[in-house]
């Protein structure tokens, strides 16, 4: 039986290969490790990991702004979008994502997110022949006039539970004046909210809202905030692993 040890020794390399033990220390492999988190520049991967929870799958139907709305994409320029992503929005749940502000995204990754949103959701002709109202809320505004405009242009949809939710001090403490204005101007087609023209809103006057009208409506909604309501802290950015 002297041949038996020799046969086992000869068969040992084959057994290793068949058993999956071929990847021993120092062995070459066609399988590469995944990239480090700060090296990921793929837009779908970055969006799904960092944005989807608040802004929804595919940029819509989330609790935060509908990023897939072409009107929103047309109204906000790259610099403002970059500043919001990088530094967050104080008083809201939008956190700062830039590493320079305590977040976990590099400048290159933020640029990749912006470029990806533009490629996927922007439509350069969305406002062809139309001049939309200013996107940012100015100081001031006539809250009393805004209340009248709200009744004429908004109340037919925002009634009952919907109205209570919109004018809830808790909700209003979570959303900035600029965010309220952006929703009125750009609309939220994912949830049926029309834009400032509200030409698809049932029962609403068909005359578009002016920039001053929107300023006054936002001033009215802002007046309903409870000063004692604590503003929401930004959602914490998960630590880098």
Name every feature range the model reports, one short phrase each.
Residues 17-20:
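C-terminal motif of bacterial Sec signal peptides marking the signal peptidase cleavage site
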Residues 33-40, 44, 56-86, 96, ...:
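Gly/Gly-Pro-rich "capping" loops immediately C-terminal to redox-active cysteine motifs
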Residues 24-33, 37, 41, 48, ...:
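Flexible coil segments in periplasmic/lumen-exposed cytochrome c-class electron-transfer proteins
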Residues 1-10:
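Bacterial N-terminal signal peptides that target proteins for export
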């Amino acid at each position: 039986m002297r041949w038996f040890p020799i046969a086992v020794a000869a068969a040992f390399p084959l057994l290793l290969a068949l058993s999956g033990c071929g990847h021993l220390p120092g062995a070459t492999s066609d399988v590469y490790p995944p990239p480090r988190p700060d090296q990921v520049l793929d837009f779908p991967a970055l969006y799904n990991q960092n944005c989807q929870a608040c802004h929804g799958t595919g940029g819509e139907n989330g609790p935060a702004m509908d990023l897939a709305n072409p009107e929103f994409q047309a109204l906000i320029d790259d610099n403002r979008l970059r500043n919001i992503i990088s530094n967050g929005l104080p008083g809201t749940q939008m956190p700062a994502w830039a590493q320079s502000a305590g977040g976990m995204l590099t400048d290159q990754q933020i640029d990749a997110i912006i470029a990806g949103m533009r490629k996927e959701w922007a439509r350069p002709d969305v406002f062809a022949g139309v001049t939309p109202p200013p996107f940012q809320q100015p100081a001031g505004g006539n809250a009393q006039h805004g209340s009248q405009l709200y009744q004429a242009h908004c109340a037919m949809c925002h009634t009952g539970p919907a109205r209570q939710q919109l004018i809830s001090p808790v909700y209003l403490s979570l959303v900035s004046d600029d965010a309220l204005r952006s929703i009125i101007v750009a609309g939220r087609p994912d949830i049926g909210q029309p834009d400032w023209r509200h030409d698809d809103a049932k029962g609403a006057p068909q005359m578009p809202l002016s920039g001053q009208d929107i300023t006054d409506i936002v001033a009215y909604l802002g007046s309903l905030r409870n000063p004692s309501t604590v503003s929401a802290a930004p959602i914490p950015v998960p630590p880098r692993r």
